[in-house]
C-alpha cells in the first residue's frame, strides 16, 4: 500500500505531464507549485537519479516463490516467470479499479496471491474465468487462488472500487525529530491528513487560506 501511494503520488507526480522534466522539491503546502528542472545536466541531480525512477514502476508488481506468485501492483505489465515457463500479462487503466490478468504463454501449477488494497473497503471481487471466487476479503492483505494448473486460456479479473478516505500522518517531522519547538519546550506531535480517492492524493484549487477549505466526503 505504501509503495503504491508513493509510486502514484510522488514518483509519477514528479514527472511533467507534457514533456520530459522532473521536479526535485515536491512542496505540498497551500498554493505550492512544482519547480520543474533538468533542462541541463547541471540544473538538478534529478536529471540523473530522478530519471531512473520512471523505468522502475514495475519493480514491485510481482514476487514469486517456488509454487506461488504475488500480484503486488495493478498496473499494465508483462511478467515472464522463467522457472515456470509462463508469461503473465496484466491489462488495466492506470490507476485501476479493475484489472485483467491473463496467462498468455505456457502452462504451470502454482497459487496466485492478489493484493487487497487498504482502501478497498466498499467491495472487492476476483473472478477466475468469469466466476466470482472472492468469498471474503480483508483490506491490507492478499486473497489466494489456491494452487492449480494454469494454462494460456485462464483469465483473472480483479474489481476494486475506489473509496474516499483521509490518510493521516505526522506533520513537522523536522521538529519532531529534535523533540523541541521554537519555544524550546517539549514538542507535541502534530498530525495532518490527506484526502484520498483510492490510492490517489487529491488536491484543491482556488483556496487562499486553510480556514476557507470545506471538506465534504
Residue ranges with predicted function:
Residues 1-116, 121:
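Aromatic (Trp/Tyr) and acidic
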Residues 5, 160-217:
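Glycine/proline-rich low-complexity spacer/linker segments in large multi-domain proteins
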Residues 88-91, 101, 134, 144-148:
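Beta-strand-rich interaction surfaces with strong enrichment in secreted/lumenal proteins
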Residues 92-96, 104-108, 117-119, 137-139, ...:
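A structural signal for short secondary-structure junctions
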Residues 110-113, 145-163:
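C-terminal beta-strand-rich structural cap/linker in extracellular carbohydrate-active enzymes
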Residues 121-146, 166-174:
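Solvent-exposed beta-strand/loop surfaces of large extracellular or lumenal domains
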Amino acid at each position: 500500500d505504501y509503495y503504491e501511494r508513493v509510486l502514484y503520488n510522488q514518483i509519477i507526480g514528479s514527472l511533467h505531464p507534457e514533456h520530459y522534466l522532473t521536479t526535485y522539491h515536491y512542496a505540498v503546502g497551500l498554493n505550492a507549485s512544482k519547480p520543474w528542472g533538468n533542462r541541463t545536466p547541471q540544473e538538478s541531480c534529478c536529471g540523473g537519479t530522478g530519471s531512473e525512477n520512471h523505468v522502475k514502476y514495475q519493480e514491485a508488481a510481482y514476487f514469486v516463490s517456488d509454487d506461488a506468485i504475488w500480484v503486488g501492483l495493478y498496473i499494465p505489465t508483462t511478467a515472464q516467470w522463467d522457472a515456470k515457463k509462463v508469461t503473465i500479462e496484466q491489462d488495466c487503466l492506470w490507476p485501476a479499479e479493475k484489472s485483467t490478468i491473463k496467462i498468455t504463454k505456457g502452462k504451470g501449477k502454482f497459487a496466485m496471491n492478489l493484493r487487497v488494497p487498504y482502501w478497498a473497503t466498499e467491495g472487492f471481487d476476483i473472478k477466475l474465468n468469469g466466476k466470482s471466487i472472492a468469498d471474503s476479503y480483508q483490506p491490507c492483505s492478499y486473497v489466494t487462488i489456491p494452487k492449480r494448473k494454469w494454462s494460456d486460456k485462464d483469465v483473472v479479473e480483479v474489481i476494486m472500487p475506489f473509496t474516499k478516505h483521509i490518510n493521516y500522518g505526522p506533520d513537522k517531522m523536522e521538529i519532531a525529530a529534535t523533540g523541541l519547538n521554537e519555544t524550546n519546550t517539549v514538542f507535541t506531535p502534530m498530525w495532518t491528513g490527506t484526502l484520498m480517492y483510492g490510492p490517489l492524493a487529491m488536491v484543491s484549487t482556488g483556496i487562499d487560506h486553510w480556514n476557507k477549505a470545506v471538506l465534504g466526503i
